[in-house]
Amino acid sequence: GMGDGGGCHPRDNIALRYMADELNLGYDLFDSIMNAREVQAKNIALELVQHANEHNMQIVIHGKAYKPNVEYCDGSYSLLIGHYCEEQGFVPVYVDPLTGDQYDPTEPCVFLLAHSASTTYKYTGVDNADKLYCNIPNGSVVVDPWRNYVNANCKVIHYGNTRYG
């Protein structure tokens, strides 16, 4: 999956770090969580850049808001991944109808499926089907950290899957 995010994310972690210090827990678990979030974002970006270099393709981050079905980008994990792509010289294109980011590629691209409504809202008990915000051309490379997407006409990478087969 993707790292956590949202506008409350920094504030919540500051409060949790303060609590850990006040309770003298002896270890700042919350700092470690924040560090792991950064490292994972950079690793995903490096994966996208590797495929973009290898296939000479544009990087498209499918989902810009901090979670599906909202327009808010504060604390967006997608933007953090995009930042690390830019550090490597690749400016990603974002596609997310609720943030006003429209894109309809005609050529194969490297896609990051950053949103999964079915995973994000599973706890509600309401069926939230995953939907694509744009066409994914045949021959594209699709990086899916949720490990749900299937498309025989694309190279699909279920990112983070350590159980092959």
Give names to the regions the model predicted.
Residues 1-165:
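Structural/interface elements that position substrates and couple domains in central-metabolism enzymes
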